[in-house]
Amino acid sequence: MEAIKGSDVNVPDAVFAWMLDGRGGVKPLENTDVIDEAHPCWLHLNYVHHDSAQWLATTPLLPNNVRDALAGESTRPRVSRFGEGTLITLRCINGSTDERPDQLVAMRVYMDGRLIVSTRQRKVLALDDVVSDLEEGTGPTDCGGWLVDVCDALTDHSSEFIEQLHDKIIDLEDNLLDQQIPPRGFLALLRKQLIVMRRYMAPQRDVYARLASERLPWMSDDQRRRMQDIADRLGRGLDEIDACIARTGVMADEIAQVMQENLARRTYTMSLMAMVFLPSTFLTGLFGVNLGGIPGGGWQFGFSIFCILLVVLIGGVALWLHRSKWL
């Protein structure tokens, strides 16, 4: 591969433009630098910035299809070969478990043995781990190591997010055992998060597996083995997601059953109350007809005796219901 001049890559509004020093560190890219396989360059761009968008649209260092893909709409994770270069689209978890993950953060990468061009619109928090290692001098030394470290960081964030969702499901199951129903929409959000994760992480696992199997010239055998380990780790996370989705379905049925039982219990209680007071209601209605005069209306103890009879009647009905094991 021919060397690249630093002035051809240095974009004024780039998030950062660094050269890997081959010892785990980086230095800012200068216009006089020479970019080659021994000293690759990492150019990280926000494709909505003016200078970055113009560079992506006009640079001869990228194939036409790659230029469009790096600044295009978000797609599912995939990997494509373009001659000596490779275009990779990845997804990352940025938010917390309380947010709606309708769209995961997308990061697109084009790389060969000399140049790494990554683009994004929203910040990719997982890259902070790789950036921190490079600034401390303990980061990757070449393009293959950079890609493995980035995929490892993305998988770490995904695994942490899946673990948090798993913990929330365990808490929800414990609450259901105590007949505690979650707030409205809580389970729907949880299930939405799991489904979105499953949608994007499954093809991302396939991307990792393909990168591990492809004989890319800038990846060593050790780096391919590490990439396969990352794919396997993400695969285990997907198995956990599938299990969590199944558990949320069971919990939805359990919540519906608990709510139905509560409704049935309240209806049963109201029915028993109506049964207890039904005889007294009949007697008070009968006495209140007053067609031939109220019986005992002229007796001073008539009303008191009638109230006592009602209490005895209600108590008798309640006792009968209790002995019949309805109460």
From Swiss-Prot:
GO terms for cellular component: plasma membrane. GO terms for molecular function: cobalt ion binding; cobalt ion transmembrane transporter activity; magnesium ion binding; magnesium ion transmembrane transporter activity; zinc ion transmembrane transporter activity. It is a multi-pass membrane protein. The chain crosses the membrane at residues 274-294, 301-321. It is found in: Cell inner membrane. Keywords: Cell inner membrane, Cell membrane, Ion transport, Membrane, Transmembrane, Transmembrane helix, Transport, Zinc. Residues 295-300 are periplasmic. It catalyses: Zn(2+)(out) + H(+)(out) = Zn(2+)(in) + H(+)(in). It comes from the Bacteria. InterPro entries: CorA_cytoplasmic_dom, CorA_TM1_TM2, MgTranspt_CorA/ZnTranspt_ZntB, Zn_transp_ZntB. Residues 1-273, 322-327 are cytoplasmic. The keyword Nucleotide-binding does not apply. Belongs to the CorA metal ion transporter (MIT) (TC 1.A.35) family. NCBIfam families: PRK09546.1. Zinc transporter. Acts as a Zn(2+):proton symporter, which likely mediates zinc ion uptake. This is Zinc transport protein ZntB. The lineage of its organism: Bacteria, Pseudomonadati, Pseudomonadota, Gammaproteobacteria, Enterobacterales.
